[in-house]
Amino acid sequence: MLGLPNELSGSQVPGATEYEPGWRRVFKVEDLPGLGDYHIDNQTAVPTSIVCVIALAAAMDISNGKQANSIELYDVTIGRPIHLGTSPVEIETMIAIEPGKDGADSIQAEFSLNKSAGHDENPVSVANGRLRMTFAGHELELLSSRQAKPCGLRPVSISPFYDSLREVGLGYSGPFRALTSAERRMDYACGVIAPTTGEASRTPALLHPAMLEACFQTLLLAFAAPRDGSLWTIFVPTQIGRLTIFPNSSVGINTPASVTIDTHLHEFTAGHKADLPMIKGDVSVYSSEAGQLRIRLEGLTMSPIAPSTEKQDKRLYLKRTWLPDILSGPVLERGKPVFCYELFGLSLAPKSILAATRLLSHRYAKLKILQVGTSSVHLVHSLCRELGSSMDSYTIACESDSSMEDMRRRLLSDALPIKYVVLDIGKSLTEGDEPAAGEPTDLGSFDLIILLKASADDSPILKRTRGLIKPGGFLLMTVAATEAIPWEARDMTRKAIHDTLQSVGFSGVDLLQRDPEGDSSFVILSQAVDHQIRFLRAPFDSTPPFPTRGTLLVIGGASHRAKRPIETIQNSLRRVWAGEIVLIRSLTDLQTRGLDHVEAVLSLTELDQSVLENLSRDTFDGLHRLLHQSKIVLWVTYSAGNLNPHQSGAIGLVRAVQAETPDKVLQLLDVDQIDGNDGLVAESFLRLIGGVKMKDGSSNSLWTVEPELSVQGGRLLIPRVLFDKKRNDRLNCLRRQLKATDSFEKQSALARPIDPCSLFSPNKTYVLAGLSGQMGQSITRWIVQSGGRHIVITSRNPDKDDLWTKELEQRGAHIEIMAADVTKKQEMINVRNQILSAMPPIGGVANGAMLQSNCFFSDLTYEALQDVLKPKVDGSLVLDEVFSSDDLDFFLLFSSISAVVGQPFQANYDAANNFMTGLVLQRRARNLPASVINLGPIIGLGFIQNIDSGGGSEAVIATLRSLDYMLVSERELHHILAEAILIGKSDETPEIITGLETVSDNPAPFWHKSLLFSHII
């Protein structure tokens, strides 16, 4: 009879009978060195496999000497892992088997396994379940042959796989690192254990724990590709529906021949549906040569050892948010304040402060804030919550120690990151005076001061306040209406306040919001100014604080519609600029002009015609010369968002050039109309030059030279990339339960992921252009799994291998792979006609066609640009035109995160991708469904997977991680697709952004320098 050696199975408990046998064992690390090869969270632990093997071995001792043909453990429940400390702590494990039914051919019983850490500790259940042993001579019938493995399995490098398990807290070494090779695709894995020599191989075990542990490992491999992030925490076995072993096969790591492990994961229970998420699958172990079944695991369930927390959430989704510059609406004209009553749309002063602060922090991340005066707890709490990581510090200055302690006490329970100081704001300090004890010493360093309950005409207080703010910083001041002239004389009041503020170094009243419910108070916004800030605020009304004798170059005016606005802009610039202002009509004229002595360039050529549309070689040469040789460029586009997708493509190209040459300053300005914005364009150009000059100096002013701006309805909008909380919640609820909340933290229902079955119909056909590779196959499987049945895949050169389509056809799907070039309109018309003649109506279209050709922009050729543009630009336009009359549920375009950050050496690729963003916005403006997906690097599929077998993937992954790119798993790809389909018909911006890692110890990569990402790093 085969069984475990005594050092694992233990000795029989005194008093046990033939029908109630039991064993006891005290485990110590020093006694069982082999157990040191398994760690959970860096702690030595008893593998779950040992629990199962002990039960199997003990079962042999109730067989009454009969030779068992099979042993089954079923309905097995497994408790928490048993940790073994390095100190001499004893953990006692006991097993008691209570017979159930027995007969000549089989025995059935129940078993339980308990542990205790000492005589005074009550036993804790480790595992329990039922067992069955069969004795009839039917072994050959039980040992079924191996089935054909699923198609599309891809090789996995073993060392990175085990390393990825170690990164989440599962450490395997020695015999427990048993897999020698493996393959996988999502939900399937195949592993091989080769014959082993050494001490472990001489263990005469019925089933070595390492063999069973390898089965568990393959289920994890089926769930997640190495380092794809899907395995976010430690998963261990918690249930086994049935474990069947055939003793005569004696499968262990000492097996003289290799064995193959086939695993199919067939169920994932998300965290929002249970206390813990679960994965469940079936595992079969075969002899590699004969292909005969040796071990069968059915209903193997693995779960995290503890509930996930917010720290383990993955912030995969980002969104581009445009908010107005707080000063871009009402402006000062000839020293007169112009007021806006409804700027914030809020009735109460605290809400006005909150709304204004949000706009300020949108542009200026990491604000250093000083609140002068006590306030309600709600205001402080709301400000801290609204700003979050966008706030560098928040200091509350109180009039006295008693008021400070009172404020501290009221906010104590909120655990907010607040500093407290005592400040007599009415005391005037002259240069050389020392602040009183407890007062802030960092004079002139605050970005924003919130002055509460102020007197509007108190010059000493305002002067002292000005000394605390850096130039460019802001003052938000609340004033009680009773302290001012009655509202009937409000024009006189505002003028007086405006003059007082200007007299102490502020801009005056930039914005004023009164309480419309009771006229009890009003909120004033003003900016701390010096000679530089005055010019940046109003370039045409201030003396430039820098020389203006250089040469400016203005490009544009070749068309009739742009000629007059451009001449107006040129004349406006001459009011301020003393140097030469040169006007050339088009980029082609740059071929005869050098740019070495040009200080800055204003490119208005997109107002004439989109540069990338019908791009000629001469125009490309001029574009190349402009972006390669210029130092400062303001690149103006016209409605790139919803009218001119080719101009959106040019934006992507400029982003890449900026990232590749950080010594240049390339600013993008999109205007919503050509006429009427000439003054704003001229101001923006001068502001860009002035901002660059100021940043080149030693100024500590609060000012940003924005990489991108947009003008909508006369207001200047500023973009920032922010976390997309709603979509991240829908992703992370797969890991844990979390509440969906609105901006005021009103709890609603639990967050839920999108149900993909609601997105597809068995009575519609879905067209995937340029998606015949691994990613397209994965998407096709997902569509079929989600209820779709008819899919057409087009490719210029489709793969002849149709095994994967036959696999899906066995599930009732109809897959057609057609040879067609997405850039050729007639070929796609033919595809559509074939579909309509033989398949259901078309319900969705996606374009995943792409071509890459990376190089420095200085080395980019006209041909390389055109080649890369065609699949994404021409292909997307063809799909838009050919399928525009179909009632589509989705129109998906696959872009890349590189288009968002501006990836160096990929200017052509970024241009192609960002064109897609423009086309999607244009389609939505036409009320057609559309969405674009800016994907991060996919792991487990495609390029990274294809180089995995040679070990090259580790180098690629290391490079991507060094750039703080977030790896996207295949499961997350499907989640992204569902979000993209849903957003394509909504009122939201139809853009999904993924793939940036925001928490990293790496040196800051290139994209961290862009203000676009200042809120996520």
Swiss-Prot record:
Region (Dehydratase (DH)): 8-306
InterPro entries reported for this sequence: NAD(P)-bd_dom_sf, PKS_dehydratase_sf, PKS_DH, PKS_DH_C, PKS_DH_N, PKS_KR, PKS_mFAS_DH, PKS_NRPS_Biosynth_Enz
Disruption phenotype: Strongly decreases the production of fumagillin.
An example molecular function term from Gene Ontology annotations: fatty acid synthase activity
Xref: SUPFAM superfamilies: NAD(P)-binding Rossmann-fold domains (SSF51735), S-adenosyl-L-methionine-dependent methyltransferases (SSF53335)
Region called N-terminal hotdog fold, residue ranges: 6-138
Catalytic activity, reaction form: fumagillol + NADP(+) = 5-dehydrofumagillol + NADPH + H(+)
Annotated protein name in UniProt: Stereoselective keto-reductase af490
